[in-house]
Amino acid sequence: MTSAAGGYRSYLESKFGQRVSFSHTERKLYGHDIAEIPSLIRPLVRNTTPDAVVQPQSEEELAQLAKWAMDNKVPLTPRGKATSGYGGAIPVKKGIVVDFYRMNKVIRIDPEGRTATVQAGVVWEKLDKELAKQGLTLRLYPSSYPSSTVGGWLAQGGAGIGSYEAGWFCSNVVSARAVLPDGSVKEFSGPELDLIAEAEGTTGLISQMTIRVQPLEKLEVVAISCPNAHDVQRFMQSIIDEKLPIWSILFINPRMAELRNKAPRQEHYGHYDEEKVTLPISYIIILTFRARDSQEVAGKLPKITEASHGERLSDEIAQHEWKNRFKLMVVKRLGPSLVPAEVVVPLKTFGDFMTDIERQVSQPLVKESVLIRDGKNGQPEVVVLGFIPSDQRRFSYNFVFPLSLIIAKVAEKYGGRPFSTGLYFSGKAKKVLGEEKVRKLREFKTKVDPKGILNPGKVIGNGLMSTAVNLAGSFTWLLQPMGNRVTAKIGERPSGPVRDIPADVAWYAYACSQCGYCVDECDQFYGRGWESQSPRGKWYWLREYMEGREEWNQAMVGTILVCTTCELCNLRCSASLPIEQSWMKLRGKLINEEKRMTIPPFEMMAAATLREGDIWAGYRKDRAAWFPKDLWEKHGPSHPSKTVYFAGCTASYVENDIGMATVRLLDAANVDFTYLAEKESCCAIPMLVCGKWDVFEATMRRNIKAV
């Protein structure tokens, strides 16, 4: 923590209490987004660990923080869920990260006006669930719907699922409120929205928004395959020309289909939790439309498909792709890293753009794209989200990364542009945003933020990173062959432990995309509200540890231990990582093998289990005191049977009625069973989850012997 932040600590603690953190670990976890900066470039960004992280819970608190920060010249970096890779949420000037996690309320839903008013930190999925209760739904949403925030999408700018019909997100915003550096609050609507949309918090901290929504209707999904990019272009142009009532158009390229087929499926202790659906190695287009329009679509689609050399795929594939539309990052497990490259190109040049990219980039390039019928210039546009599988642990990652600049340069050649500005492409702001918008942003920024405290170095800033990106763009002729010569290795390949982290867990730590799907639904996180308590926070910390920048301490050991093992993170994970199983493996490593301290009450439980066979410190001689006397002769330990009723510690010592009710039900059902009485010991599951695996094993062996 800097000396300046040290002087401000008392103010922040008195104002925000438990909603401000100065913890080294916490601050580090709020100093990055989903992208991994190559090691050769990282020095240009310098230290991005903020001095503090603050979580305001109201617009009033946000305004007070902004006014204080301006008076004290403290930089403020707003953070929704940091699901972008453009660096917009990275605190390049340190200062304070403003985490909007607690500003997550749905303020008002207007069914008649078809609008919703929300705080900026509300997650799309949460909002959609609230809308559904009133027969409404979102007009469009990002592919990061399970984790990203409404305010973050306005600040970043974007298009997503539903954008074929609804366009860019900004055009679906009625109004937005933002806090200015002087602590005042201004409402933006109409053309004025351009002063905060895509500005990434550089001109104001978005606090509240009103967006347009639509009636909730049944949707139908169709999947079409096309052999090449020009056929895809022809198909989509025909959809537009025929005015088919389509709500959303998504598509993937053949390499994405290939890698999805190779990607590991979700498992639960060796058993697959999902069916295997094999995709054809082709472009796969997913059309989504309202059920009431199905007849019109069905009448015209076959002719359009045939003219584009396409083929309608099975309903199984269509439903599988729609169900997994948020699991784009499953291919990251094969990397375990991805080099991102996101651009926007006109539909009319899409085929040529893709053909040129395939010629210039020989690395495996996976793409998922969204078609916008009415783009920013009134013409159809395609948002192309591309990834190159790579491995950030290898030095060669530094050579693969510049290929993203090649893709951006080719996009510009065909009338396109980078998707966003952020930290890396602020030097291309005029291409991304347009000259007139950049001029207005500069004027407004100069007027309201003369001290430059709001998200410095982004969008229209001129930092070292932006300068380096522009410079590198002039040397693509040199960087391109170097990146293409790197040998691409695809597939999970854990090779051995890294420091003391098991090989598979080490691989998963890098395979985690930091998408944040696991965060809000995590029991451990929502009881505390800080990144270190989330699965993605732990994965990132493990990377830092394996690279020698962090060391284990009791706080981090405790963070691994307090997971409730509910496994909801496994179900939410966009890469289908075995998260809970990894934490269990680390518990055994940290506690059983390295003899670190577990949660103190478990030490007492372990002692009681070894001595008396139970976690409640009851005497073994009293273990069977609960058993009904009238059933002792019929089902007691002297009665031989192939079936044993295992009561366990809690039923034996604490909640006797559980055991009593169970044995009476079994007896009434004429089930023959026996009971071990004092020979029975604890199930030892508490010893398993707290990492004391030696006690778990000894107790299990004792139970097996008793049977």
Predicted segments with their positions:
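Glycine-rich N-terminal segment of FAD-binding domains in flavoprotein oxidoreductases
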Residues: 25-27, 31-103, 138
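Iron-sulfur-cluster electron-transfer modules
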Residues: 506-509, 539-707
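A glycine- and small-aliphatic-rich helix-loop capping segment at beta-alpha/alpha-beta transitions
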Residues: 88-104, 132-136, 159-170, 209-216, ...
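A charged N-terminal "starter" segment
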Residues: 1-28
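Short, charged low-complexity linear segments at domain edges
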Residues: 478-504, 533-554, 660
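FAD-binding subdomain of flavoenzyme oxidoreductases
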Residues: 105-252, 453-454
